[in-house]
Swiss-Prot record:
The gene is CHS3. This is Chitin synthase 3. The lineage of its organism: Eukaryota, Fungi, Dikarya, Ascomycota, Pezizomycotina. One of its GO terms (biological process) is septum digestion after cytokinesis. Belongs to the chitin synthase family. Class I subfamily. One of its GO terms (molecular function) is chitin synthase activity. Residues 1-70, 86-138, 745-768 are annotated as: Disordered. Polymerizes chitin, a structural polymer of the cell wall and septum, by transferring the sugar moiety of UDP-GlcNAc to the non-reducing end of the growing chitin polymer. Involved in tolerance to hyperosmotic conditions. CHS3 is the only V.dahliae chitin synthase that is not involved in virulence. It is found in: Cell membrane.
Length: 886
């Protein structure tokens, strides 16, 4: 146990009972469960449900009444449950009550206040005005107009949770369980701290240290996807609370963990997901405000320590009693401003207030394993210079692997597995992982910070949010398509630092993968373009490795890895051309007299024409059609490319078998060495089987070979789809830098709060409505959405930006097409190149396929060599992992 942390709840106080609306003790209160004095959290309510006698100007604000009467949630007794005292996050000068941290009594004084208040009294406590009963039925409604005191214009409300929920909760005597805190942020996330906003963890009498800060970002995901992620997070928190022998974790580990849910746009959040948050006690309808003191609210922040768990039964989310508390911070952004802005709220606003040790990033729908977050944290604990880590992303295969029946899911499963078996371990062995996936990764907060000049990883990470078209270069304007890759590069190359990145095999996260062609095309457009521009960025800034404080050996290793990534990028650039060359060489070879003869020549011509038509169709559809509107075209092309791949595999096997038979029947004694000297067998079989053999061997050594049996064939058949359809669509849409969502969506208009001399009036729902709000969610507001009128200058700026990106797109596609066409023409001696050089014509007459065969040999063996390099790195990763433990 760390010195100064009190892990027992209220060891020196008397157990308190909640005054529930029914007689008898609360069914949610746990007898003998006490509250820790350091966990005392005074409400921001001068006229609150807490000891109304203390609302007098002559009352001692530091004196607590009897525990049995601390709270009353009877709506007939108190209509001013929402009244809030001024929000003053500035701690008092000096040490409260004369105690210094570490001295006896620092953690054990029940009378020590949370924060001092200079003025807690309002001139007009409340006035209740009954309003006509609504059409909904017999619920007594009150329009409660309250006097609200603001601190420097900040509106903060402590709202009691619905009694129906409160009756189910243990620890009901503590404020963090009985009240939900709402803050109306009216500033940019970068100014959240300077505007004197704070969070609950800093307001306890002894502020809580945040060891793990977990963010779940969402847009319009349904309640199933959201619950899937939250169930995984809750299981991890429970796992850490059960580690009773740990120096960091233990019974009260939940106090060191904060779960932040950031929803991108109030008008975009799924109503069922919002209702689920309300069921957990985190969200309440009717609290949010549109403006505060003339300032537009940018984010609605709800804080609550929930004890409500959930499970998914037959496709329905069910709330269940949860004994393990979880501190939840729900940030509902007013506008849809993309995921990178959600991360800016997480890092720049909330992270600066809480100053966490480790930050974990999750996408809604990604379910971490039961102890995966702990294993991520452990990697940082074991390696002080670890700046970032990621786990294994798994494709969600369904019960019994039923989703593998879909070839697209099986192909992505194979792709994910091989990346986690070869690519990630190799990069981890060098210390630089090119991308830590935002769906499931973790960072050390201190490593992310910028320097005194404001330059650093976070500055680069958020740069793309404010860049505009022609005002920026090609690298900067496309940076945020690969912001996670840029962040990884900036961390490892951070000036005067020697941070490294690690892959943690023990940490896993399951995620849904696209199950239709159109969804896959749209997803990979951003992925491929992001990785392409990130690779260009890394190549253009490779020298920044040398500004870091890494050792000479580490810099050499990073330089080798940089060369490896450069070679991979070259192969990715020429992937379309290389695939066509292999296709052309093999189909022409089948026309030989010793193979299929005239039949092979006819098949070669037919398939070549079909190949050209399909590739041309890909370009036409990619330049203007939406994939969702061309679904049948894309599906047809997937089947066609699969047929092409079957034909290629047949050609390779048939040619190799014929070559072996020729060696056997040539009249000389057959030997294995002679077989390997056969150029056809050596080029086709040995090189290709070396690549596939390395895949099998590495999978078995990682004790994860099943994808080789369930997904390998599907991956082989859909390889041409990845090369032609996905690459073509991605390059033809490099001008589209969107995430698939539009910004500046207008939500329903909310009430506003205006102030004068630091106080003002606002309408708040009466406590008698809480149960009704808890049972149902409002679906509409009376006022219409606010229409944004764009000035001509803004429209011209947006059009200029799109023109710039279209120009970048045109240049990129032209360069890509010309270079790939040129490669094919040179290798195949086509497009009239054979008539330019007379010497070349003579060589072509002797062996027309010599150049093509040499090139195919180089390509196939290069692929095998890259696979072998990955295998060596993966084996080194396994050796290090044996000693490291995670």
């Amino acid at each position: 146990m760390q010195q100064g942390y009190q892990l027992d709840d209220r060891p020196y106080g008397r157990p308190e009972q909640l005054d529930y609306p029914q007689t008898g003790p609360s069914p949610g209160a746990v007898p003998g469960r006490y509250g820790t004095p350091s966990d005392q959290l005074q409400l921001n309510a001068a006229q609150s449900v807490d000891n109304l006698s203390r609302n007098s100007p002559f009352a001692d604000p530091h004196q607590r009444g009897p525990y049995q009467t601390d709270y009353a949630v009877n709506p007939e007794a108190h209509h001013d449950a929402y009244y809030n005292q001024p929000y003053e996050p500035t701690p008092m000068e000096g040490t409260p009550l004369g105690y210094d941290p570490g001295q006896p009594g620092y953690d054990h004084d029940d009378l020590r206040p949370m924060l001092p208040h200079q003025d807690s009294h309002a001139s007009e406590p409340y006035q209740d005005q009954p309003t006509p009963q609504g059409a909904g039925g017999g619920i007594k409604r009150w329009k409660t107009v309250k006097q609200v005191l603001l601190y420097r214009g900040n509106l903060v409300l402590d709202c009691p949770v619905p009694p129906r929920l409160l009756n189910q909760l243990p620890h009901g005597e503590r404020d963090e369980f009985t009240h939900m805190r709402y803050s109306a942020a009216t500033c940019d996330p970068d100014h959240f701290y300077e505007e004197n906003f704070t969070l609950r963890q800093r307001l306890f009498s002894k502020p809580r240290h945040t060891e793990l800060f977990i963010v779940v970002t969402m847009y319009n995901e349904d309640e199933i996807l959201f619950a899937r992620s939250m169930i995984g997070v809750f299981k991890n928190i429970e796992y850490m609370c059960n580690r009773k022998e740990s120096k960091t974790w233990g019974k009260d580990a939940w106090k060191k963990i904060v779960v932040c849910v950031v929803s991108d746009g109030r008008s975009k959040i799924n109503p069922r997901t919002r209702a689920l948050l309300a069921g957990m006690g985190v969200y309440q309808e009717g609290i949010a405000k549109q403006q505060v003191n003339g300032k537009d609210v940018t984010s609605h922040i709800y804080e609550y320590t929930t004890q409500v768990g959930m499970r998914i039964e037959k496709g329905v989310v069910q709330l269940v009693p949860k004994q393990q508390p979880v501190q939840i911070l729900f940030c509902l952004k007013e506008k849809n401003q993309k995921k990178i802005n959600s991360h800016r709220w997480f890092f720049s606003a909330f992270g600066r207030v809480l100053d966490p040790n480790i930050c974990v990033l999750l996408d809604a729908g990604t379910k971490p394993g039961g102890n995966s977050i702990y294993h991520l944290w452990k990697a940082f604990d074991l390696e002080p210079m670890c700046a970032g880590a990621c786990g294994e992303i798994k494709a969600m295969l369904g019960t019994g692997g039923k989703n593998l029946l879909n070839p697209l899911i099986a192909t992505q499963n194979f792709e994910y597995k091989m990346s986690n078996i070869l690519d990630k371990p190799l990069e981890s062995a060098f210390g630089f992982i090119s991308v830590l996936p935002g769906a499931f990764s973790a960072y050390r907060y201190v490593a992310l910070q910028n320097d005194k000049k404001g330059q650093g990883p976070l500055e680069k990470y958020f740069a793309g949010e404010t860049l505009h078209g022609s005002d920026a270069g090609i690298f900067e304007s496309n940076m945020y398509l690969a912001e996670d890759r840029i962040l990884c590069f900036e961390l490892v190359t951070k000036r005067n630092c020697h941070w490294i990145l690690q892959y943690v095999k023990s940490a896993t996260g399951e995620t849904d993968v696209p199950d239709t062609v159109t969804e896959l095309v749209l997803q990979r457009r951003r992925w491929l373009n992001g990785s392409f521009f990130a690779a260009i960025y890394a190549i253009a800034h490779f020298y920044q490795f040398f500004r870091s404080d890494h050792s000479f050996l580490r810099k050499v290793m990073l330089f080798i890895e940089f060369i490896f990534h450069t070679i991979n990028m070259v192969f990715a650039w020429f992937a379309v051309g290389n695939f066509f060359l292999v296709f052309s060489i093999l189909t022409k070879s089948l026309g030989g007299d010793e193979l299929l003869g005239r039949t092979g020549e006819i098949l070669g011509v037919v398939f070549t024409w079909l190949y050209g038509v399909a590739l041309f169709t890909c370009f036409v559809l990619s330049m203007g059609n939406r994939p969702s509107g061309s679904r049948w075209y894309y599906t047809t092309m997937v089947y066609f490319w699969a047929i092409i791949m079957v034909y290629l595999m047949f050609a390779a096997i048939f040619i190799a078998v014929k070559a072996i038979m020729a060696d056997v029947n040539d009249g000389t004694p057959f030997s294995l060495g002679e077989l390997f000297r056969n150029p056809v067998f050596y080029t086709l079989i040995v090189s290709v089987m070396s690549t596939y053999g390395i895949w099998f061997l590495a999978s078995f050594l990682m004790f994860d070979p099943w994808h080789m049996f369930t997904s390998f064939v599907q991956y082989m058949l859909l390889t041409p789809t990845y090369i032609n359809i996905l690459n073509v669509y991605a390059f033809c849409n490099t001008h589209d830098i969107s995430w698939g969502t539009k910004g500046d969506d207008q939500a329903e208009k909310l009430p506003s709060v205006s102030t004068k001399d630091g106080s003002g009036k606002t309408d708040l729902p009466d406590e008698s409505d809480l149960n009704a709000q808890y049972e149902r969610e409002l679906t509409a507001f009376g006022s219409k959405p606010i229409k944004v009128v764009h000035t001509p200058t803004e429209a011209q700026r947006a059009e200029a930006q799109m023109d710039y990106y279209r120009g970048v797109r045109s240049i990129t596609v032209l360069a890509w097409m010309i270079t790939n066409f040129g490669l094919a023409a040179v290798v195949l001696s086509a497009a009239g190149l054979d008539r330019i050089d007379p010497k070349h014509q003579t060589a072509e007459e002797e062996d027309p396929n010599a150049r093509a065969n040499i090139y195919m040999t180089v390509v196939l063996w290069s692929v095998a060599g890259l696979a072998a390099f990955k295998f060596i790195g993966a084996m080194w990763f396994l050796v290090v992992r044996m000693f490291r433990g995670v």
